[in-house]
Each structure stands twice: as structure tokens, then as C-alpha cells.
């Protein structure tokens, strides 16, 4: 399936050492990861901070690729990210806060993830929840799954609808040119229905690690 799987795309850069770390993101990318992680845990466990919980889940998910295996319990053994803990955090965030970012993360775990067993029906469920709440990557994946009938009954009207929805975002934005072959397979009535289902004022939700910029460090 040609879907967008980006949960593990997490890169650290280096801040100038004299720049004051005002957010957890600053701490994470400036070499003060332990301090940043301590703040994240405190906010997640004591303040029920959704952003802190989400970023903590990302750190567990990407631990092996960002050199966190020597830190606390971020890895299983020496080389593998602690996906179990990441999934636990995302599940709590989804169940307790209806967080669309967490739903997207869970969808990826069921969508051809090497550590967890694939379950396209569950993947579609979480992608759809996320897509309906503004995550562009999920909107693209839902469109793709409707197009190919993966985890859901094939429905080209719904596929076009979700591709069009994603086209309203910074992720897609290619217009109808990329899906004209699908549109050609619809009747005029079906195409009008697909367009009518698009929510033009849907707020875009960012699932990247830069969410940590919203978490103040002090």
C-alpha cells in the first residue's frame, strides 16, 4: 500500500549553546535530553499534559534512531525502540483524550509495522478517527485505503473525497491533477457528492515532533 508512514521521521539538530532553552523541544535538540525527558514525564504524569504525553510517546517510538537506548527504559535490549511503551502511551492518550495524533500513531502500528501484527481494519479505524479530526497524513491514508479496499470496502467516492480533503492541507495541496484517473471513474453525481463531503475549514493537526515547541520547559 502506498501510504504515508512518518512516525519514525524524527531528526535532531544542534542549537547554538548560548541560546536559552525555553521549550522542551529546545532541550531535546540542544543536548539536554535528560532534562527535557524529566520535564515531559512530570507534565505527562502530574499535569496530564497531552502534548507532553505525545512527545514522550514519540521518543519511545524513535529511541533506537536518536541514540536514546542508553537512557532509562527507552529501548528493549540495546538496539530496539520500546514500541510497547510507546503504544501504551498512545493508547492512553487516544482513549482518555481522543487525541488524533495518538490515533495516527496507533494506526501505523497496525499498518505493516515490523514489530506488531498487521490489522488493516484496525489501522483504517484509527486513520479515519485521525483524518476526521484534521491530520493530513491520515486523510491521505484513508483515501488510499478506500481506493484499494484495504481494511475497508473499496469506495472510490470516499477515496476521492479524502484525497480532496487532504488537498486542502500543506501536505497534499496538489489539486485534482493527481487523482484525475479516479475522478474519471466516478459519475457526475458521485463526484459532486465527494466534493460536498469535504470540510473546507477543518483545522490542520501537526503530528511532528515540533509539537514539543508548545511545551514550556520552565
Q: Which ranges hold each PLM region?
A:
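Sec-dependent N-terminal signal peptides
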Residues: 4-13
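TPR/TPR-like (Sel1-like) alpha-helical repeat modules
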Residues: 74-81, 154-174, 195-203
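Short helix-capping/linker turns of helical repeat alpha-solenoids
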Residues: 32, 45-53, 62-67, 71, ...
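Terminal, low-structured helical/coil segments at or just beyond the last alpha-helical repeat
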Residues: 173-218
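Alpha-helical tetratricopeptide repeat
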Residues: 18-25, 54, 100, 104, ...
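Hydrophobic face of amphipathic alpha-helices that form TPR/SEL1-like repeat modules
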Residues: 57-67, 73, 103-112, 141-148, ...
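Alpha-helical adaptor scaffolds
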Residues: 76-79, 83, 91-135
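Structural signature of tandem alpha-helical TPR/SEL1-like repeats
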Residues: 31-38, 66-89, 117-126, 153-161
Amino acid at each position: 500500500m502506498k501510504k504515508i508512514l512518518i512516525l519514525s521521521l524524527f531528526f535532531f539538530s544542534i542549537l547554538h549553546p548560548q541560546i536559552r532553552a525555553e521549550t522542551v523541544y529546545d532541550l531535546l535538540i540542544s543536548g539536554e535530553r535528560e532534562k527535557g525527558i524529566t520535564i515531559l514525564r512530570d507534565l505527562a504524569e502530574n499535569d496530564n499534559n497531552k502534548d507532553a504525553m505525545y512527545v514522550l510517546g514519540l521518543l519511545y517510538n524513535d529511541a533506537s534512531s536518536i541514540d536514546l537506548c542508553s537512557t532509562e527504559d527507552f529501548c528493549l535490549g540495546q538496539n530496539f525502540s520500546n514500541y510497547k511503551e510507546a503504544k501504551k502511551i498512545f493508547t492512553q492518550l487516544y482513549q482518555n483524550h481522543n487525541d488524533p495524533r495518538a490515533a495516527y500513531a496507533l494506526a501505523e502500528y497496525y499498518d505493516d509495522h515490523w514489530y506488531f501484527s498487521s490489522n488493516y481494519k484496525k489501522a483504517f479505524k484509527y486513520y479515519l478517527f485521525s483524518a476526521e479530526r484534521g491530520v493530513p497524513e491520515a486523510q491521505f491514508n484513508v483515501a488510499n485505503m478506500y481506493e484499494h479496499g484495504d481494511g475497508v470496502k473499496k469506495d472510490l467516492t470516499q477515496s476521492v473525497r479524502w484525497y480532496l480533503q487532504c488537498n486542502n492541507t500543506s501536505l497534499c495541496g496538489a489539486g485534482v491533477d493527481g487523482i484525475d484517473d479516479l475522478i474519471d471513474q466516478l459519475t457526475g453525481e458521485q463526484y459532486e457528492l465527494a466534493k460536498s463531503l469535504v470540510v473546507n475549514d477543518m483545522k490542520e493537526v501537526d503530528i511532528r515532533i515540533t509539537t514539543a515547541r508548545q511545551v514550556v520547559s520552565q
